């Protein structure tokens, strides 16, 4: 009994000490029909358990063959008796189905023969090892790797040296795949999530997250936890076709650290060369001894395991953590010298701070350490990014969950730049991006702080890959796989890890990759983003400032850039929009929105261009010019902004043909009248003759329109009057706008002064018609169009300008028409004294009429600028007369006359309406509120909303207007958007002094009133007192 127990313990120890490199499937062994009864230990057999892993060179002994034949005969006889008994029962129950019974009997006999043949094959392939007794145990103990003549590891590793399967030919496909791991590729991963019957694995070698069912895990599922490393095979689900993980098994991590730190003594120090302080190659490891439960253990360590850049000597007291590698070997790591008299000083940088604690990134190891604010020496206030010096203590308390937690103590601040983590090489390398950063999934970047990869050729012409992070680029622009970049190498002093930094994108990328690049200009800028005007796109394109490649250059409007267009990532395709990335600045005049096709083409105007372009189906309609090209008659569109002077129908013009890149349409640019150009040459010749004529009474300044009122006359057929070309003027006569003879104004045909073919210094006059936030429009003397002007071109303070004010200006021949529409902008705008421009005399008769057409500032869609008033008969069915009006015709220049408004007016000598005054119904209401430059009246319009009014519509002193005041006003409805507002707001009386207080009080004096004699106080915010926290005995009142 003692011998057997000794053998049993010895065999158990042998089995525990044998290394296990794989596992076998128990279901496959059960299918082999292994008997469950075995002989006693003294004469036990291993014939069924080992399945014949004996080498083929040794055959079974005669005793083993005889014993094997007896067992087979007993099994066959037992099976035949069982089948014969079943056959008799079926024959008695199924006498009517004799034929079916015979077929079944034949099938059963066939199965018996097959089973008999399989058993014989198994016996031939897997002969028994032999029989052992207790006397042979000593030999087994002396040679533990071999039992008999085969390796003990072979039982678990499928025979090690033999090619036969451990499960025989009858094993299933799944067990055969498990036995031969070379058939499929095994991957490693980390358990990310576990649910009630399934989980998810995060792959280590690639960015993938695979589903797995608990039935695919080989082991106790209760032992599997989140974060455990596992090994698996990737397959595809038959129903959904998605990749899943199968045959999941738990593996040991590469290095397992003990939670607690252990103290010990250095017994063998690292040998270094004292002269050069270089590690001796003969002694690369040292040894540390420590005690555990009365036993002494020795652990190896290397120089990389020592913290603080200190040299350990024999006998030094140290603390360390025990690490277990993948092979199960133990070692010491994170070794720290423990010297209470002179503690080791460590350095680092404060990386994060909370309410009363923070973390320091250590400069000696890649690790962060905890610290409390109270550990800072003196009154030093630490901030993130400060360089500090500290000591390390290990504290153990019940309040700290991890026992033996490390704390930073005695923290002192160092000078900025004292702590250096890495050394940056000055050599500029050129490489190619293998793996770009996935900025749309920051969760995956947290797992790897350096997820990017760049491949470059080293100095020894070897291919090297280096990682990089999200802060290593010169900017946050988008990097793609295959981009060519230049960078610097930064080497971490702590672990000698190299990474790429100062990464800049090379222009070679766009040339090699064939990436489609587009051009445009910056149209507008916001906070952190902006919009581009594209050459080949109609809509503006969104972009982030971070996508600009040149971070040293400021972004300004009208900068010419080159970019790539993509769909905005992170959104569905229906909701996503286009955006520009990888934006590169271009030299000035590099971007051309139009391409010159032909120049100096002559044609004839067949349709005049409208003064305001008409949009129809996303297309702007302009004028039409007909010309001949290669004996083919063609038409081309033109706009007023591209003309020096608006041509009329039938006039001959010369122009250049440009093709717009965004819509591939051709337009006429630089349109000039051929006849006008010749006329200018004739006028210049005539002026030259007049100057040489000694008897001429008109000097050169008079011919250029230098009179005070802007009117000039000459003996030529065409005279200039206020910048207008007057045709048909009587020779030698002088005309004036303010003349009492109205016949002169009817005889002349006034041309548009905005594009007159005169010199750039020609001075024009007009009236302020519209004023916006930083620009406005000037109504010309002919009252038929407006001229755009920016406040920056006004010579004076634009706040002093008023509607209807008389001004003079010059025109910019080639000005910026993108902001002024089709009309050229005005420059050098100056205010004139009142009544500087004479006006026609106004008749005294007052008429009533209806506005048939408002001014173009009220309705920008109409082509005519001037408004129109109709005088109707008593039945309001027949139009008696029509009269145009402008900004100078209005009594109240801020009055917005709309179509259908009733007005009273007079008529001047030219037939235009003057002294126009709107006839509106006056209403009264009280002021509800005033908010800066606008307010609201207690007058309900538009579904109960209060009526809006602007402070500019208030007549009189606007400061005296307060909420509650009674005002008189008129209601105006904007026909474009349907919104109503109040105009001509006039204050009637003030609000009563105690109106609000009287409204709150009840007017009935007979009922009781609630009077407030003391206002309530809020809580102090200091919490309860200390006495309120003391326990008290129920029933006893404490005073």
UniProtKB/Swiss-Prot annotation:
Changing residue 898 to A: Decreased affinity to RNA. PROSITE patterns: CSD_1, CSD_2. It comes from Drosophila melanogaster (Fruit fly). GO terms for biological process: cell differentiation; dosage compensation complex assembly; negative regulation of translational initiation; sex differentiation. Residues 186-250, 261-337, 345-413, 428-503, 517-585, 593-673, 763-831, 846-919, 922-987 form the CSD domain. RNA-binding protein that acts as a regulator of dosage compensation in both males and females. In males, acts as positive regulator of dosage compensation by promoting assembly of the MSL complex, a multiprotein complex that mediates X-chromosome dosage compensation. Promotes MSL complex assembly via association with roX1 and roX2 non-coding RNA components of the MSL complex, facilitating the interaction between non-coding RNAs and mle. GO terms for molecular function: lncRNA binding; mRNA 3'-UTR binding; mRNA regulatory element binding translation repressor activity; protein-RNA adaptor activity; RISC complex binding; RNA binding. Residues 49-126, 165-184, 721-741 are annotated as: Disordered. Pfam families: CSD (PF00313), CSDE1 (PF23456). This is RNA-binding protein Unr. The keyword Repeat applies. Residues 49-62 have a biased composition (Polar residues). It is found in: Cytoplasm. The keyword Repeat applies. Changing residue 198 to A: Decreased association with the 3'-UTR of msl-2 transcripts. Changing residue 975 to A: Decreased affinity to RNA. Interacts with Sxl; cooperates with Sxl to prevent translation of msl-2 transcripts. Interacts with mle; promoting association between mle and roX2 non-coding RNA. Interacts (via CSD domain 7-9) with pAbp; promoting translation inhibition of msl-2 transcripts. Composed of 5 canonical CSD domains that mediate RNA-binding as well as 4 degenerate CSD domains (non-canonical) that do not bind RNA. Interactions between canonical and non-canonical CSD domains mediate RNA tertiary structure specificity by reducing the conformational heterogeneity. The CSD domain 1 mediates association with the 3'-UTR of msl-2 transcripts. CSD domains 7-9 at the C-terminus bind to poly(A) sequences of RNAS. The lineage of its organism: Eukaryota, Metazoa, Ecdysozoa, Arthropoda, Hexapoda.
